[in-house]
Each structure stands twice: as structure tokens, then as C-alpha cells.
């Protein structure tokens, strides 16, 4: 039996709280102005029309509308279709 704990065991035993990242509103779903669409670390998804970016890279709706996801040249963008809105 060792009297010392060993190098590995003292460095274990931590766990961080989950950050609740990810897509909050999916494609063709309605969102109100100011509603959060995606929480992310870095610009994995780029903002399109009527979508703003927060200081923590959160994408949010500038107007109410339907969420549209598009991928052009390997870049994923999120935009809002404000023409047909029924919220």
C-alpha cells in the first residue's frame, strides 16, 4: 500500500458546469425579435440577414421571422425569412 496518493489522483476530481451551447431554434421555426437562435463558441455559424451577433458569439433575431439555415462554400449561415410570419 502506498503512503502517497500518486500524481494522477490529486489532479482528478473536477468537473465544470455545462455551458448549454447549441442550436436553440431550428430551421423553419418562428422566432421573435431578440430571441436567441444559437449559442456558440466562436463563429461556427455566421449571421445572415436579420440576424445579429452578441459579444459571446450568440446569434439572435433582429426581427421576427422564420429561421433559415444555409451552407454556401462550406460556410454555414443563419438568416431570417420575415415575409411570411405567424407567431
Swiss-Prot record:
Pfam families: Ribosomal_L27
GO cellular component: chloroplast; ribonucleoprotein complex; ribosome
Gene Ontology MF: a single term: structural constituent of ribosome
Record-linked NCBIfam families: L27 (TIGR00062)
UniProt protein name: Large ribosomal subunit protein bL27c
Keyword hit for Chloroplast: yes
Entry-linked HAMAP family: Ribosomal_bL27
Annotated family: Belongs to the bacterial ribosomal protein bL27 family.
Region (Disordered): 1-21
Listed transmembrane segments: none
Compartments, as annotated in UniProt: Plastid, Chloroplast
Organism: Emiliania huxleyi
Gene coding for it: rpl27
Amino acid at each position: 500500500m502506498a503512503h502517497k496518493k500518486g500524481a494522477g489522483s490529486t489532479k482528478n476530481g473536477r468537473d465544470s458546469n455545462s455551458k448549454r451551447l447549441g442550436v436553440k431554434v431550428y430551421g423553419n421555426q418562428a422566432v421573435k425579435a431578440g430571441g436567441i437562435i444559437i449559442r456558440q463558441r466562436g463563429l461556427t455559424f455566421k449571421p445572415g440577414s436579420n440576424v445579429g451577433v452578441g459579444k459571446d458569439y450568440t446569434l439572435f433575431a433582429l426581427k421576427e421571422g422564420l429561421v433559415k439555415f444555409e451552407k454556401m462554400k462550406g460556410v454555414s449561415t443563419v438568416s431570417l425569412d420575415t415575409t411570411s410570419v405567424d407567431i
